[in-house]
Amino acid sequence: MCKIVYLTTRRFDRASKLFRDALANELRNRGVEVVTENAFDIFNRFRQHRTYGIAIAFDFYRDGKQGSGLTLNRNCSYIGRDFAYNLSNDYDRLTPMIRWRDLEFVDSDNKRWFRFFNKVSASTKAIFYLCTINNEYDWNNYNVVFPDVVKLFADEIIRCLRSNYNVDNYRQRVKSAKLKIHKVQE
């Protein structure tokens, strides 16, 4: 199985790139091969098709409302759904003041999905909207926990890679990680 992680953002989105690069550095420090690219646009229209293990896109809402969101493909694998579910739950525990406002299941030809994952194949794909960037309350809460969010994403990605994309193995790893966290907190 492919153990390469693909991280992408929109080309001119500074905040998303900051998170993507911080996560990429954290994963590289842990020995994971990471590819970072910009989303599909006129400048990279002729890139070749690639296959990765995990593909994640990062973006922010810009409508002034409050909250974060998650977008998955309608035909995503069980490991992809479990991975996104665990990441969203852990992100929710870390940032309870940023509420989830959107969970979408889209087709592959959806405009946003196509922009981020055109010519990319992966066992696990997801688009995370980390918060609303032009909502001051959301943005401040996100910036306070920024290093912890990077570590959270890195931990979950490592867990998924070590399971070799086996759903049962991944669920066991998540369960044992939660038990370790509860023991440390007590």
Language-model region placement:
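Active-site-adjacent substrate-binding region
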Residues: 78-107
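A generic structural motif
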Residues: 36-39, 102-104
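Extracytoplasmic/secreted envelope proteins and their assembly/folding machinery
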Residues: 16, 20, 24, 43, ...
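Active-site-adjacent mobile loop/cap segments within catalytic or ligand-binding domains
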Residues: 5-6, 55, 65, 105-185
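Active-site microenvironments of hydrolase-like enzyme catalytic domains
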Residues: 2-3, 7-10, 38-85, 108-134
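A domain-level signal for caspase-like cysteine endopeptidase catalytic cores
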Residues: 2-36
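Structured segments of extracytoplasmic/periplasmic soluble domains
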Residues: 22-33, 86-97, 156-167
